[in-house]
Amino acid sequence: MFDWTFFSFTSLLGIAIAFSYVLVFGNITDVFNFDGIVHSYIDSPYWFGMSRNNVYSLIVLQLLAAVGYIMWIIWVCTETNYGTSVLRFRWVRSLLVVLFLGFSTLWPFSAYYYMVSPSLGRSLLTCSCLWISSIAAILMVAGTFEANSPPYALVGILLLSNVVVLADGVGWSAKCIQHSLYS
């Protein structure tokens, strides 16, 4: 039986992420201005001077992560037997998704806060959003392995976590902290 309540809830949070990215990075309200802002995702100062080829590579991975998340959430909404997995409790599934999506939604605002006036403290605040999302994603991966999920769910969560944990939680955080220390 498909869990429409959980699906609707996670869909709304997913839309909130998209909205926060468009609102802050697209600056559609002209509220999120700072020196050096451009209206190109590829040339955005939020990439901290990464080469275009690396940005393109990360965008491909981001798209695969979005597809992976959809694959995983479909499994979570249709699965009824998680065995002894941490995901067997609905409140755990909900908490992990809320932490992951909630802090992913807050991240663009914290990143803007950093860009307005870079400092080590602000970079750590910004990175903490990514770190909390990363921890939630790691636990989602663990629960998916524990539940002996079907291959599509496992591949989906691994695609997602490669971006959330490695590209964002480690890579982008390293660039942000480096920027705060040496710029």
Where in this protein do the model-derived segments appear?
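Alpha-helical transmembrane segments of multi-pass membrane proteins
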Residues: 13-33
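Juxtamembrane "helix-exit" motif on the non-cytosolic side of transmembrane helices
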Residues: 24-31, 107-120, 142-146, 169-178
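Perimembrane loop-to-helix junctions flanking transmembrane segments
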Residues: 32-54
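Interfacial helix-start motif at the membrane-water boundary
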Residues: 48-70
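Non-cytosolic membrane-interface motifs at loop->transmembrane helix junctions
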Residues: 51-52, 116-130, 151-155, 181-183
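Membrane-helix interface/capping segments
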Residues: 67, 71-89
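Membrane-proximal helix-loop-helix units in multi-pass membrane proteins
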Residues: 81-137
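Terminal transmembrane helical module of multi-pass membrane proteins
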Residues: 136-183
